[in-house]
């Protein structure tokens, strides 16, 4: 069958070429944006006197009916069409005759698809941001529940200083909050209308680009027609933001995987978010966390695929750009699923306070506080640091811990030690003394929770 774009050629192509060229299998998900954009375009054409109001009314009514039919399932997308734009125009022309052929006046598929994908990704950005907010709420609620649960803090995966589980969780809440901010910033740049840029050079018709932009909820226009149809940096930026988000989820997943192991036993995952083994009946595998960690690489791959596609393209539109959609659609779909699963996993997670505290009692994570004790009594920090290290070495040799080392052995290193040192190196006291803004004390964590909840309400 001849194509709507048949002009210089007869429009008849081999089936294998049709299949290779077609994008309707994946761009059909943008049917709503395509139809809404066309309705705004028809209204603008009439407002500028390019077509009659009667024709515009027929076009808008016809498009509205197509949208309704697609929504309720009485119309099925024909996957033999080249793309969603051609499908909608074909159905419209079949129903309206020559009036349907007027819709594409002062428009190209180049600006049409750029419009559709901006509108579609605008919605995806909003949905993903809402899902991140739900996850932040789950993390923050869990942090409040465990704001006083002692946990060993790590550097280099070695026990470092005592913190609380609530403090650790709030670190991820802060990261996720920045992910929401990145999406909002990305959306702001994305929300510029390319319609009216036409194929690449603009149009000879007296169009009103602002009319369509305002009607479709855009904040402004793409101010150069070549740029409007030929760049996909807004896709790249969105996928970059999603990659950073997935990096945060992957790090969180890695810790959950470690914490849920028998070697740590810091957390217990709900049976609803774990799986078993086909051969080992004792297993309870953190598959959801592992899949999130694994799917992070998939989203990274989507980003790199699009960057690689775009890097060598001359202006303006090239068919290579059809490859933008599968990558960005896959990234959005993957991220949404990961966020939904992750939120449920966090909501049902239970922490083992006893095991976390037991782990914190090993590894001399109060050694810094021991040094600070001497500093507050007038000793230079580097001297105090050295003495604290010597005492740790002595404890290791004697198979004991700082809290149980007798006072006389402390006095052998410095006469500044007194009985009050045991209070200074008590783990909960070590936590509660860290009152600096953003610190791990219960009061500080509660303030972090308050600030995040306040930000979520903004």
Predicted features, each with a name:
Residues 117, 122, 129, 144, ...:
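Charged, flexible cofactor/metal-binding loops and thiol motifs
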Residues 1-37, 98-99, 280-458:
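Glycine-rich cofactor/substrate-binding loops
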Residues 1-202, 207-211, 275-276, 287, ...:
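A helix-coil-helix interface module used to build multimeric assemblies
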Residues 41-51, 120, 167, 236-244, ...:
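Short, well-ordered beta-strand elements within core beta-sheets of diverse protein domains
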Residues 41, 62, 66-69, 91, ...:
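Generic, well-ordered alpha-helical scaffold segments in large soluble proteins
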Residues 38, 85, 89, 235-238, ...:
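Short runs of predominantly hydrophobic/aromatic residues within well-ordered alpha helices
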Residues 54-55, 152, 222, 383, ...:
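A generic structural-conservation signal
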